[in-house]
């Protein structure tokens, strides 16, 4: 059997992102999203669960965009002089305090559960989970809160060894230059048996998105492809079952 999780990253980043994710669920093949709990529109998750009853909500652990949920003095090694997360986590987290990383990750998890939506899994913004200072905390929290996780090529081996439930395949090539209908159809044709996740970033591009993200206009194209009738028909005709991470329950 071929099970497919089409996940819309970055829920909460802007209203346009949220709207694009909802549109891709209602009129397309998206069945999962992940919430940036430190972003201004994360709370909208609780408002859309009624109109998106089969949408799974994950936690998009974020350590390099926006501000932390904790007071800056509690996570001082993670933030700059203005209280924002430092950019470029691959370098900045090398000097970060592990305990501060832990309390911020757990605060984001607690925020997600407070939203009153079905929390199905954990993943991370820019793949921060794979950082050597983060991965063990990420796994420990997945175990503590009984959550499956997205595994990337950089961390799949250690996640599998931990026993945490995860996907069989992760596709991250429907992004940037790969955002073409032909590429998505190619990905779908090559799907293997098991559970595959395709990472996506659909949105309606608004002024705020242009201001806060360098990955912007391609999100609009992603949304149009995810709701394209040819894509929807291909999924139906090829016995691909659309699911979210609740399949692990």
UniProtKB/Swiss-Prot annotation:
<comment type="subunit">
    <text>Homodimer.</text>
</comment>
<comment type="function">
    <text>Probably catalyzes the deacetylation of acetylated carbohydrates an important step in the degradation of oligosaccharides.</text>
</comment>
<keyword id="KW-0479">Metal-binding</keyword>
<dbReference type="Pfam" id="PF04794">
    <property type="entry name" value="YdjC"/>
</dbReference>
<dbReference type="GO" id="GO:0000272">
    <property type="term" value="P:polysaccharide catabolic process"/>
</dbReference>
<comment type="similarity">
    <text>Belongs to the YdjC deacetylase family.</text>
</comment>
<keyword id="KW-0378">Hydrolase</keyword>
<feature type="binding site">
    <location>
        <position position="125"/>
    </location>
    <ligand>
        <name>Mg(2+)</name>
    </ligand>
</feature>
<keyword id="KW-0460">Magnesium</keyword>
<keyword id="KW-0119">Carbohydrate metabolism</keyword>
<dbReference type="GO" id="GO:0016811">
    <property type="term" value="F:hydrolase activity, acting on carbon-nitrogen (but not peptide) bonds, in linear amides"/>
</dbReference>
<protein>
    <recommendedName>
        <fullName>Carbohydrate deacetylase</fullName>
        <ecNumber>3.5.1.-</ecNumber>
    </recommendedName>
</protein>
<dbReference type="InterPro" id="IPR022948">
    <property type="entry name" value="COD_ChbG_bac"/>
</dbReference>
<feature type="binding site">
    <location>
        <position position="60"/>
    </location>
    <ligand>
        <name>Mg(2+)</name>
    </ligand>
</feature>
<dbReference type="GO" id="GO:0046872">
    <property type="term" value="F:metal ion binding"/>
</dbReference>
<dbReference type="GO" id="GO:0019213">
    <property type="term" value="F:deacetylase activity"/>
</dbReference>
<dbReference type="InterPro" id="IPR011330">
    <property type="entry name" value="Glyco_hydro/deAcase_b/a-brl"/>
</dbReference>
<dbReference type="InterPro" id="IPR006879">
    <property type="entry name" value="YdjC-like"/>
</dbReference>
